[in-house]
């Protein structure tokens, strides 16, 4: 099994900043946990891939959450990532699938919808948050992340995302790239890169052919123009815990907790991101009430 990872690079003497990722295993983990059907797998996988690369732009303990809500049948897509390559995600309606579109591809646009917003919240530490959003312009997601960067962060970018799904619903290939134009970039560089992106083979096909993140960027930017900086391993990782959900239950207040004791003699919580279930005994709930009244 090939390791998922992101590569960071500069190109054309610093005119271009670039990221590329192979995320096949992480998207497979999400597919397995949520039992997503193919169109939902593609939508979730594309969102997770973009989010992972955006996470790789962060530093230290910073993290970010991306929410895509196009008011389509799939509902909301939520993914979050950190600077260390940990990624997780879920969709409201994982069992969403449609016939292939006119191009013979998974109809992600129909599932996502085109009437809504893409929102990014960055947790940059010390309880400091940056939030930006942009309208969904395509529903195919690559174009929507491209538009987000142009309008919300004022960084001209090209975002390519792809997921191929096998007939048995497993993930055949997943990955993508983010190419960003730095301030004062030369016009001829921008023209070259735009042309290369316009002519390239779909990213999911390149990953399926076995191309690494480095080879993806070489394909777009040309071997002689790219300087690779570092790689970040990517994995599906959820940081939920018994303790975190216990604190969340505590936040519901005494009346709500008492109702759980009276009606169910305990409680169960399920994590949206990884589907882990946590059981809480009547004694634990009574302990929370005691803490609230201490």
Swiss-Prot record:
One Gene Ontology biological process: protein refolding
Post-translational modification: Under oxidizing conditions two disulfide bonds are formed involving the reactive cysteines. Under reducing conditions zinc is bound to the reactive cysteines and the protein is inactive.
GO CC, alphabetical: cytoplasm
Subcellular localization(s) per the UniProt record: Cytoplasm
Protein keywords: Chaperone, Cytoplasm, Disulfide bond, Redox-active center, Zinc
Gene Ontology MF terms: protein folding chaperone; unfolded protein binding
S-S pairs: 238-240, 271-274
Function field: Redox regulated molecular chaperone. Protects both thermally unfolding and oxidatively damaged proteins from irreversible aggregation. Plays an important role in the bacterial defense system toward oxidative stress.
Family: Belongs to the HSP33 family.
Protein name: 33 kDa chaperonin
């Amino acid at each position: 099994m090939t390791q998922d990872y992101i590569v960071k690079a500069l190109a054309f003497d610093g005119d271009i900043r670039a990221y590329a990722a192979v995320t096949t295993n992480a998207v497979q983990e999400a597919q397995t946990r949520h039992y997503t059907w193919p169109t939902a797998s593609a939508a979730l996988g594309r969102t997770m891939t973009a989010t992972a690369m955006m996470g790789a732009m962060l530093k230290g303990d910073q993290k970010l959450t991306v929410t895509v809500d196009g008011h389509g049948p799939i509902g909301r897509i939520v993914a979050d990532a950190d600077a260390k390559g940990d990624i997780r995600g879920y969709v409201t309606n994982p069992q969403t699938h449609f016939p292939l579109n006119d191009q013979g591809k998974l109809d992600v646009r129909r599932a996502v919808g085109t009437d809504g917003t893409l929102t990014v919240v960055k947790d940059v530490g010390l309880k400091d948050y940056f939030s930006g959003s942009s309208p969904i312009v395509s529903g195919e997601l690559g174009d929507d992340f491209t538009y987000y960067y142009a309008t919300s962060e004022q960084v001209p970018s090209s975002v390519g995302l792809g997921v191929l799904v096998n007939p048995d619903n497993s993930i055949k290939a997943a990955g993508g790239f983010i190419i960003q134009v730095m301030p004062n970039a030369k016009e001829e560089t921008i023209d070259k890169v735009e042309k290369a992106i316009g002519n390239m083979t779909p990213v999911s096909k390149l990953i399926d052919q076995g191309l690494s993140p480095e080879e993806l960027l070489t394909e777009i930017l040309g071997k002689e123009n790219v300087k690779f900086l570092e790689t970040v391993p990517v994995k599906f990782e959820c940081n939920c815990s018994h303790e975190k959900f216990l604190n969340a239950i505590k936040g519901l207040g005494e009346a709500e907790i008492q109702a759980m004791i009276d009606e169910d003699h305990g409680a169960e919580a399920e994590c949206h991101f990884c589907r882990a279930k946590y059981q809480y005994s009547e004694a634990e709930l009574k302990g929370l009430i005691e803490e609230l009244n201490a």
